[in-house]
Amino acid sequence: MVEQAGEPAYRAQQILDAVYRQKVESAEQISTLPQQFRQELEGQGVSVGWPRIENKFVSEDGTVRYLIAFADGQSVETVWMPEGDGGEAGDGSEAGDSAEGNRARNWDRATICVSSQVGCAVDCQFCLTALLGIERNLTAGEMVGQVCAVLKDQKVSPPEDRINLVFMGMGEPFLNYDNFMKAVRLLVKYVGIAEPRMTVSTAGIVPRIHDFGLEPTRPKLAISLNASNDELRSRLMPLNRKWNLEKLLAAARDFPLRPRERITFEYVLLREVNDGAEHATEVVELLRGIRAKLNLIALNPGPGIGFATPADERVVIFQKIVRKAGVPAFVRRPRGRDIYAACGQLKRTVEILPAMESQRL
């Protein structure tokens, strides 16, 4: 854009600085640009600034689900979780037993869950986002824009405020890899969120796991496991037919970890489907030889999903079996389940069902 206008390359840096650091909302507000260039940008309809918050829903636990709209009318969801979703890492590890609502500023850290695509093509059978199908990839600017819009609405500013990011919203980040990595670099350089405070979750795009391990600047890696054998995983996650557990776990074993770093494996527990003691034992064998930790997620319910949430005692037994084998295992507490903001519930739901009613702004 800058080159096409015949402007020097450093103008691009001025625009990025104005958008992400000065938080301008139009080209006319970028005082470092020549007036003529600003007018040209305005005349061409160039969108400068952040996406628009179209709607937001507030949970009883303080979680906020944002419906964020882009210039072409498409929208995604972004989730704000005061106190994160458990643990300093912001990835659900070391989750506590309960979380109080955080309407006031009484939190030490927060986590933002970011979307990478409009919809999702991976088609996990227990995820509401899969029901949307896939519309398009998000640009790097749209991913960063989600974060900036939420930070502005919450009146926080990293690095002064401790903000974690998880790329675990709508979409598969590794199917939009180049834009995702560009967004990471922009977030580090201009927004002030260091990559160790970011985690990306993949359903198992094996070639991109290899690529990701070679990145000089990268977030932490989480892998969505969800089954203890290929037959079950192929039924729950059709992607497994292309990259099965053998290929996926080989990529995990080869992944270059930093000191004290572990790969997080996420496991959504479905009642009497993958939540038995035999499944826990199989998971232990799968993770043998990998510096890993396991996040257990009891299914978050939603219409159109043909699975049920497991009983609490089955979750506890599963966790005990894995921990006894020496694998750190944590139960991620649900955040925003009442407003369809929890893991697997993002489907741009506007009308909240009576059983899941909460405050709407």
Predicted features by range, described:
Residues G84-S98, A104-L151:
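Canonical Radical SAM [4Fe-4S] cluster-binding loop centered on the CxxxCxxC motif
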Residues G62, A110, D161-N164:
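Exposed loop/turn and edge beta-strand positions of beta-sandwich/beta-sheet ligand-binding modules
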Residues M1-N102, R253-E261, Y267-L361:
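Auxiliary Fe-S-binding modules of radical SAM enzymes
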Residues Y66, T78, I112-V114, I223:
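Short beta-strand motif preference
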Residues V150-F330:
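Conserved AdoMet/S-adenosylmethionine-binding subsite of the radical SAM
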Residues S59, S115-S116, S201, S224:
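Short linear Ser/Thr-Pro motifs
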Residues K56, N102-A104, S157, Y190:
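Short secondary-structure boundary/capping segments
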